[in-house]
């Protein structure tokens, strides 16, 4: 009898083949459900624990199902996952404007079959609504507005040649407020995304309309770039479209894929991400991959160089949000040494190497609103010439101040001396340093006379020699 009792106690209890709570929690995960049952079979004493885990999982699934909208169905235009990246289609990060963004409105301009690269990579219809409303992109199959931005919230618009393409193309980059990669929205809102689309050189190939007048593709003779540029400049109120300028920067290396054409870009890396730098009249762009970064002059604290080697160098940009806060450091690496002199000239022209001028740049807030292209170009030229002289003056004063505060005097410097005589006297001291004490005393007297002459300048000629 005792033998039978011992043997029966050694037999493990039967594992339930189905537990309702586990079946419900892992209904969509059969492989995970099987692993749970296998674990229960090995350790049946933990059945209550697995049931508690299953109940908690079911509650999480129910909570998520009620708090989120149902996922969009995949269509011929792309998977639903990509669509959900743009929350409700508004890249400006302002949900209150969604109704207006997608509402039917009179169009100032539209162009079909435009190749967008950001925030989605697909062909869409570009639209600009009348009255300075919205710039938006519409799906050509479903006719739904995919994304857009209020025109009044556009901070920068750039028109740049696409690098390293056999056929000439232009990228239009629309950067919303707080979407430049440096400034961020208040209140923890998601940063808006930039909008980038490409147009080929030459007349538009697809139908477009301006102020309700339809134009067939290829008609009119005006290039697609000029058409879009004109429409945007007419619609924009706070800025104008910025293009590369020979007076700002031209790469030392011509465009590799289009012989005889100037290149306005410089290849660089940010971490492992390859991109292109454009040095423009209002700031520096790093693109064209997500996320775009635009360093407006008013956001740049200073620019310096690191890892200057025989073939490459790095560019370090300290940038600060317009609202203030701590500066952020951005390192752009592996820049070709051939472009060093051109980049250095650009940086010095705009005083970007000098952190002491950062407040002045922020106060200036480069603004070309309301100017024609010709007037803006002339004004920018005059401002640059005037700014150069002021920057050079500030730089000289800063260098003189540093020389005065330096403890160890450097005979090779151009700054003020500590009473050791002029540069010619210093050379004499080096050559005659082993002469007797009388020669040293004579040289000290000459040094004192030269110091007086240096301090008084032209007035020293009016003082009798015996009084010097």
From Swiss-Prot:
Main location: nucleus
Regions of compositional bias (Low complexity) in chain numbering: 67-76
Annotated Pfam families: Rttp106-like_middle
Origin superkingdom: Eukaryota
GO cellular-component term (any): chromosome
SMART domains per UniProt: Rtt106
UniProt region (Disordered), positions on chain: 67-99, 368-468
Compartments in which it is found: Nucleus; Chromosome
Molecular-function GO term, any one: histone binding
Keyword entries, A-Z: Chaperone, Chromosome, DNA-binding, Nucleus, Transcription, Transcription regulation
InterPro entries: PH-like_dom_sf, RTT106/SPT16-like_middle_dom, RTT106/SSRP1_HistChap/FACT
Composition bias type Acidic residues, residue spans: 399-417, 424-449
Function text: Histones H3 and H4 chaperone involved in the nucleosome formation and heterochromatin silencing. Required for the deposition of H3K56ac-carrying H3-H4 complex onto newly-replicated DNA. Plays a role in the transcriptional regulation of the cell-cycle dependent histone genes by creating a repressive structure at the core histone gene promoter.
PANTHER family, A to Z: FACT COMPLEX SUBUNIT SSRP1, HISTONE CHAPERONE RTT106
Subunit structure: Interacts with histones H3 and H4.
Similarity field: Belongs to the RTT106 family.
Protein name, entry field: Histone chaperone rtt106
Species, as recorded: Aspergillus terreus (strain NIH 2624 / FGSC A1156)
Classification of source organism: Eukaryota, Fungi, Dikarya, Ascomycota, Pezizomycotina
């Amino acid at each position: 009898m005792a033998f039978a009792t011992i043997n029966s106690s050694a037999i493990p209890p039967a594992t339930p083949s189905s537990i309702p709570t586990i079946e419900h929690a892992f209904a969509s995960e059969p492989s995970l459900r099987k692993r749970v049952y296998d674990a229960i079979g090995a350790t049946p004493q933990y059945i209550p624990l697995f049931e508690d885990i299953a109940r908690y999982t079911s509650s999480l699934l129910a909570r998520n199902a009620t708090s989120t909208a149902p996922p969009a169905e995949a269509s011929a235009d792309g998977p639903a996952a990509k669509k959900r990246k743009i929350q409700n289609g508004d890249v400006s990060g302002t949900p209150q404007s969604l109704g207006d963004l997608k509402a039917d409105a009179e169009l100032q301009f539209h162009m079909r079959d435009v190749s967008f690269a950001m925030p989605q990579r697909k062909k869409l219809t570009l639209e600009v609504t009348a009255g300075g409303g919205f710039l938006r992109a519409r799906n050509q199959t479903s006719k739904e507005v995919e994304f857009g931005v209020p025109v009044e919230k556009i901070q920068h618009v750039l028109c740049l040649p696409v690098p390293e393409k056999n056929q000439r193309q232009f990228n239009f980059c629309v950067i919303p407020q707080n979407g430049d990669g440096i400034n961020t929205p208040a209140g923890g809102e998601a940063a808006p995304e930039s909008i980038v689309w490409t147009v080929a050189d030459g007349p538009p190939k697809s139908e477009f309309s301006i102020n309700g007048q339809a134009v067939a593709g290829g008609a009119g003779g005006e290039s697609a770039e000029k058409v879009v540029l004109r429409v945007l400049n007419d619609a924009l109120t706070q800025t104008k479209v910025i293009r590369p300028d020979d007076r700002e920067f031209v790469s030392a290396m011509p465009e590799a894929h289009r012989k005889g054409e100037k290149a306005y870009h410089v290849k660089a890396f940010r971490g492992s991400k390859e991109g292109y730098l454009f040095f423009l009249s209002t700031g520096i762009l790093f693109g064209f991959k997500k996320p775009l970064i635009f360093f407006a002059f008013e956001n740049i604290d200073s620019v310096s160089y690191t890892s200057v080697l025989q073939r490459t160098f790095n560019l370090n940009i300290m940038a600060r949000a317009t609202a203030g806060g701590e500066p952020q450091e951005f390192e752009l690496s592996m820049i070709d040494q051939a472009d060093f002199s051109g980049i250095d000239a650009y940086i010095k022209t705009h005083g970007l190497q000098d952190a002491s001028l950062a407040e002045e740049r922020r106060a200036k807030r480069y603004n070309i609103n309301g100017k024609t292209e010709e007037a803006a170009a002339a004004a920018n030229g005059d401002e640059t010439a005037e700014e150069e002289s002021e920057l050079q003056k500030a730089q000289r004063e800063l260098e003189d101040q540093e020389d005065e505060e330096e403890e160890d005097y450097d005979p090779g410097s151009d700054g003020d001396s500590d009473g050791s005589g002029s540069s010619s006297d210093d050379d004499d001291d080096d050559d005659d340093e082993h002469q007797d004490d009388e020669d040293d005393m004579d040289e000290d007297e000459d040094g004192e006379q030269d110091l007086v002459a240096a301090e008084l300048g032209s007035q020293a000629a009016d003082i009798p020699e015996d009084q010097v």
